[in-house]
Regions:
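Extracellular glycan-interacting surfaces
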Residues: 1-282
Length: 282
């Protein structure tokens, strides 16, 4: 509140916070902010910058149950990349060859049933990944990669990368049907805890793959806009009892078929995330 007009500090742009469930002796947490990944061991009373530098705008951080940290920093900053750390202090940039040099926000999806597997869905990967035409004459590039940790620091031969970008929904009947993260505004990737091949990605619409996006033939749209929506008054509609622009997806721990979907319209519930067509409750 005391910042001069036109200025800001890193806490004005705090993208997300995660807690370390493996640290039983300290109140350890991580925060993705403008330009930095911060770490605290006293419940947020004080913070240290562990990653960053420059003007990396879109940053993210997630953590496994045993304290392995994954962080992403967009390409505007000197600390750009996809990073892995076993302790939050020593970091390794594991970004794969062929990822591209320009990229924006990245969503991170850790596989709960095998936390060595992590999906990275990245918006605005200029001239790299899947190209899609979007509504109102727009266009975008999006990348989807799956990483598997093998050994050591997880880099080079100690990590395996698979580029799944070609299977992001594109070339659909209308531009409303194509994947569209709108510059990273609406972006998510989640893995079903009890079925590791069931992967959800979200942009304007919400999609479910039953083969981990290893193909484009086992993917269905389960939310967002109605399929076939198009420009013009009366030519578009929203999925029944759901809403476009996806931001998060949560699985009920006691029943992984029950999900909560957060988007621009609010929070929606489904009691069977494998159903097609999908039935939502608002």
């Amino acid at each position: 509140d005391n910042n001069p007009a036109g200025s800001f500090n890193v806490f004005d742009f705090a993208w997300n916070i995660v807690l370390d469930p493996s640290n039983l002796n300290e109140d350890e947490m991580y925060m993705a902010t403008y330009g930095s990944i911060l770490r605290s061991v006293d419940g947020g009373e004080s913070w240290l910058e562990e990653l960053g530098g420059g003007n990396a705008y879109y940053n993210n951080v997630e953590i496994t149950t045993d304290g392995i940290v994954y962080a992403t920093l967009s390409s505007e900053g000197t600390g750009k990349g996809i990073w892995r750390s076993a302790d939050g202090m020593e970091w390794t940039n594991i970004i794969p060859d062929g990822f591209g040099n320009v990229y924006g926000r990245t969503a991170i999806g850790i596989n709960p049933s095998n936390e060595n597997e992590v999906y990275f869905l990245t918006a605005e990967t200029e001239n790299s990944g899947q190209y899609t035409n979007t509504f109102f004459g727009g266009e975008t590039w999006t990348s989807l990669w799956k990483y598997t940790y093998l050994c050591g620091d997880g880099n080079d031969s100690c990590g395996n990368w698979i580029n799944l970008s070609a299977n992001i929904p594109a070339n659909r009947p209308t531009t409303f049907d194509n994947f569209n993260a709108q510059g990273g505004y609406d972006l998510l990737v989640k893995v079903k805890p009890d079925e590791p091949n069931v992967v959800f990605i979200g942009g304007t619409n919400l999609w479910r793959s039953t083969d981990g996006f290893t193909s484009d033939s086992n993917t269905v749209q389960i939310g967002g806009y109605v399929e076939g929506s198009d420009h013009g008054y009366g030519n578009w509609d929203i999925y029944s009892k759901h809403h476009p622009l996806q931001h998060d997806l949560l699985f009920l721990p006691s029943d992984n078929n029950i999900i909560l979907s957060a988007n621009d319209g609010g929070v929606y519930k489904s009691t069977n995330c494998m159903a097609s067509p999908h039935l939502w409750y608002s």
